[in-house]
Amino acid sequence: MTYLEALRTARVQSPQSYLYTTVARMHLGSVAAVCISILISSGRMTVKQLSSKAGIPVKTVKTTLVSLIQLRCVQYWREEGSGRVLYSFNEEGIWILLQSGEIINWIRCEYGEEEAEIIQNILEIGHIKVADYLTNFEDQKRHDREIILMRLYSDKWLRRLQPFNFNPLADIWEAKYEETIRSIPRTNTTSEIKRVTEAKEQTKRKIIDLFQSADDPNVVFTVKDGIKKLNPNITISFNLARFEKHLRSEALFHLAKYKVGTLTAKVYETALKLVEANSPDLNPQFLSISGWCADPEEVKSYKNSIENKLVDDRKITFGVRDVARALPEDLDLSCSILTHNFLKPTKRASDGANGAASKKVKLEDGESLDVFVENLEKNDSQSSSLILHHLKALCSGTNISFLHETSPSNFTIPYSALVDELKKHHYDLLIKITLGPNAFRVLRALKSLKLADEKALANAVLLKEKTLRNEIFNMVNLNIVEIQEVPRSADRAASKTFFLFRHKEQTAYNFLINSLTFGMAELLQGIVDFKDEHRILLAKCEREDVKGNEESLLLASELKTLKTLQEREMVSIARFSRLKALRQVFSA
């Protein structure tokens, strides 16, 4: 199978397959793209099966799979009886490749150049043993890198990698479940349903314990000369879930900025950063197991239980003082609107009045300075009071509760509820901007009515019948509105049938995710096609004698084509980033 054949197959199979195949082609080459396309379409396979289907030599396939496993794009599973090794696709590695530039830039801005260099090195090779990485440095430089690694691991940007991380989670579940169900004997007093339920619960506990063992502090850390360091024998990799939490925090900050204003949103951003590392994952990994949760309600309950446990353990709670300490120094809240609403103006004391209690502080040059302790305490209390009012506004200032107050002056962030509100907000804006205000009115009416016929909908939105039908037609084509047929007779005669309309959020979101994914793939494929079309010119520009001398060695037409290529690539990447950010919101 050639790359073009694999691309055509991926394009018609699913938007995700199209995107992943295109990304693999751009970053890893044609052979890797063909292997990934086949693994997505055919499921897990052996090396020989993959080689036969792809028409690629076994040796080349093995070499490619090693690289893909290293970069977490492929996982493997060894069967117990036959000993066969089966390979399957893992989308986590592709998403790391897609967001690697953004990840490095964020680490550079937040931490520094050396931290960004470490993350870049780990992203390039997938994972690395701590001892192997530190052998590249000597003495003080080595000590500095140990501190940086410890900091990045403590902030959860890095995670410990174990052998089971290379295995598909579904296969681990099946193996543990089979082991557990065999250990529970069949009895006359216990029903099969109860036996299976008990086996599932035990399997869940085993898998949770298995994954929690990766964070065992006795294994991960060592103490030398009173300094806590990472164990040099562990293997570390980048934690994609941590970056997804950062993206969620950014999205929530922008939503707060839109709803309550810039200054209050800045306070909220500080609060988000305080608990970001310990916040619940956007997509808990165990939910990918088919037997973990039975229905959507159970999934929702499971996510809420994770969040509630974090609140009970005080891992995602914070106080006013925590926010006050973490606020940026250049953020002046005294100019906010809340100042005049909640703080009384200070009375100007007369010159003859009794002054506030003062304290003598000795300076370096021997002179003393009167420090008015009472005034300092007043300023601190006023600052804390002002921050508290900003936090109160985030709790109940809008129709969205950005915070919940768990106890006086202590707050938590309701992530599950906020993610739902975030999706609704962005979806409503998309409908309003792309389809117009009339479609937005129809959508809001359907959300309110739940299920409505054309007449009830027309009365609710106050639109003409023809206009309403046009809007509904467009919205049905985009899976925003669903049609439900209601027959009035047993023979379901068309003349006696009427139709109801409804809006299902998850169905609409899934259609939007697929549309955004396909758009992302089309943009990347456009870049690839344009580069392939001018590959001779690009190869010429890569020559050592041409680099830096393009203007003197290239023709005017070639320079124009090169400029067009650069501009087109920049525009496509900018559009791609916007689509990716929007997809991230609805994928949570």
From Swiss-Prot:
Query: Mind telling me which Gene3D superfamilies this protein's record contains?
Result: Winged helix-like DNA-binding domain superfamily/Winged helix DNA-binding domain (1.10.10.10)
Q: How does it assemble?
A: Component of the RNA polymerase III (Pol III) complex consisting of 17 subunits.
Alphabetized SUPFAM superfamilies for the sequence: Winged helix' DNA-binding domain
Q: Which family does it belong to?
A: Belongs to the RNA polymerase beta chain family.
One cellular component term (GO) for this entry is: RNA polymerase III complex
Molecular function terms, GO-annotated = DNA-directed RNA polymerase activity; single-stranded DNA binding
Checking InterPro entries in the record gives: POLR3C_WHD, RNA_pol_III_RPC82-rel_HTH, RNA_pol_III_Rpc82_C, RPC3, WH-like_DNA-bd_sf, WH_DNA-bd_sf
What protein is this chain from? DNA-directed RNA polymerase III subunit RPC3
Stretches the record annotates as Leucine-zipper? 516-537
Example GO biological process: tRNA transcription by RNA polymerase III
Please give the function described in this protein's UniProt entry: DNA-dependent RNA polymerase catalyzes the transcription of DNA into RNA using the four ribonucleoside triphosphates as substrates. Specific core component of RNA polymerase III which synthesizes small RNAs, such as 5S rRNA and tRNAs.
Q: Where in the cell is it found?
A: Nucleus
Q: Do the record's keywords include Transport?
A: no
Which keywords are on file for this protein? DNA-directed RNA polymerase, Nucleus, Transcription, Zinc
**Keyword match Mitochondrion:** no
State which residue ranges cross the membrane.
Answer: none
